[in-house]
UniProtKB/Swiss-Prot annotation:
Gene: Mpig6b
Glycosylation, residue list: 32, 112
Cellular component annotations (GO), alphabetically ordered: plasma membrane
Organism: Rattus norvegicus (Rat)
Protein name: Megakaryocyte and platelet inhibitory receptor G6b
Post-translational modification: N-glycosylated.
Lineage of the organism: Eukaryota, Metazoa, Chordata, Craniata, Vertebrata
Purpose of the protein: Inhibitory receptor that acts as a critical regulator of hematopoietic lineage differentiation, megakaryocyte function and platelet production. Inhibits platelet aggregation and activation by agonists such as ADP and collagen-related peptide. This regulation of megakaryocate function as well as platelet production ann activation is done through the inhibition (via the 2 ITIM motifs) of the receptors CLEC1B and GP6:FcRgamma signaling. Appears to operate in a calcium-independent manner.
Length: 232
């Protein structure tokens, strides 16, 4: 009974020609749009309730135009889901999709219009297109990982620089100036001087002692015992 009371205003609006109708449905349902009170409709427009769900801006946008050929022109967004049920565009059938919630306007030649408000169950203000949702989730994970990796890299570079600055420089071996090798002639001269060292001892004897010995030998008689003095 309660359900009948809720649907009664909708049924009465269709019978009485109320210019504004409200409909609800799930994605995949088919709903009928009718121009109520408009005798000669020329186009349909749509103002989405949640433009972000379809990546659109706010405001009205035309979705279908009457054509002289009899085949109406449908906006790409509703292509394959919106079709006319008669020779004109007075009655349409729409296959609902997520994000279709909004107000559909039927405009006539005298700029009179009727409105049909459609609420797709599940639509909400925070919805996003599925592609952008996956992209946003991927970016939410990727950006922190990149930031964490950058911090780790900078930390490692800083640690290496700090260790290098704290460690004293390695011991450098003192530079030894190698003496030039002496020629063979100098070596032979040095060896010759070493061989002559015993003769130098005799050459360096104190001659005053020898002279004193001679004087003593002159004063001592010949028969006196000879005294030899060896000076080393």
């Amino acid at each position: 009974m309660a359900l009948v009371l809720q649907l009664l205003p909708l049924l009465l609006s269709k019978v009485q020609g109320n210019p504004e109708v409200s409909l609800e449905g799930n994605p995949g349902d088919r709903v009928n749009l009718s121009c109520i009170g408009v005798s000669d409709p020329t186009r349909w427009a749509w103002a989405p309730s949640f433009p972000a769900c379809k990546g659109l801006s706010k405001g009205r946008r035309p979705i279908l135009w009457a054509s002289s050929s009899g085949t109406p022109t449908v906006l790409q967004h509703f292509s394959g889901r919106l079709r006319s049920l008669d020779t004109g565009i007075k009655r349409l059938e729409l296959l609902l999709s997520a994000g279709d919630s909004g107000t559909f306007f039927c405009k006539g030649r005298q700029e009179n219009e009727s409105r049909t408000v459609i609420q797709v169950l599940g639509d909400k203000a925070g919805c996003r297109p599925s592609g952008s949702t996956h992209g946003s989730e991927y970016s939410k994970v990727l950006i922190p990982l990149l930031g964490f990796g950058l911090v780790l890299g900078l930390g490692a570079l800083g640690l290496v620089w700090w260790r290098r600055s704290c460690v004293p420089p390695s011991h450098i071996a003192p530079v030894i100036n190698a003496e030039p090798q002496r020629p063979l002639e100098q070596d032979s001269k040095i060896s010759g001087h070493l061989d002559q060292e015993p003769n130098l001892h005799y050459a360096d004897l104190d001659h005053s002692v020898l002279r004193r010995h001679r004087r003593m030998s002159a004063l001592v008689p010949g028969d006196a015992s000879t005294v030899y003095a060896v000076v080393v």
